[in-house]
Amino acid sequence: FLPIIASVAAKVFSKIFCAISKKC
């Protein structure tokens, strides 16, 4: 499991959470 993948996944999750909660 690469740190780079974890970093990208965190950014993607952040965008998804932002879209769902609409608290950007």
From Swiss-Prot:
<dbReference type="Pfam" id="PF08018">
    <property type="entry name" value="Antimicrobial_1"/>
</dbReference>
<dbReference type="GO" id="GO:0031640">
    <property type="term" value="P:killing of cells of another organism"/>
</dbReference>
<keyword id="KW-1015">Disulfide bond</keyword>
<protein>
    <recommendedName>
        <fullName>Brevinin-1Pc</fullName>
    </recommendedName>
</protein>
<dbReference type="GO" id="GO:0042742">
    <property type="term" value="P:defense response to bacterium"/>
</dbReference>
<dbReference type="GO" id="GO:0050832">
    <property type="term" value="P:defense response to fungus"/>
</dbReference>
<keyword id="KW-0044">Antibiotic</keyword>
<comment type="similarity">
    <text>Belongs to the frog skin active peptide (FSAP) family. Brevinin subfamily.</text>
</comment>
<keyword id="KW-0295">Fungicide</keyword>
<dbReference type="GO" id="GO:0005576">
    <property type="term" value="C:extracellular region"/>
</dbReference>
<keyword id="KW-0964">Secreted</keyword>
<feature type="disulfide bond">
    <location>
        <begin position="18"/>
        <end position="24"/>
    </location>
</feature>
<dbReference type="InterPro" id="IPR012520">
    <property type="entry name" value="Antimicrobial_frog_1"/>
</dbReference>
<keyword id="KW-0929">Antimicrobial</keyword>
<comment type="function">
    <text>Antibacterial activity against Gram-positive bacterium S.aureus and Gram-negative bacterium E.coli. Has activity against C.albicans.</text>
</comment>
<keyword id="KW-0878">Amphibian defense peptide</keyword>
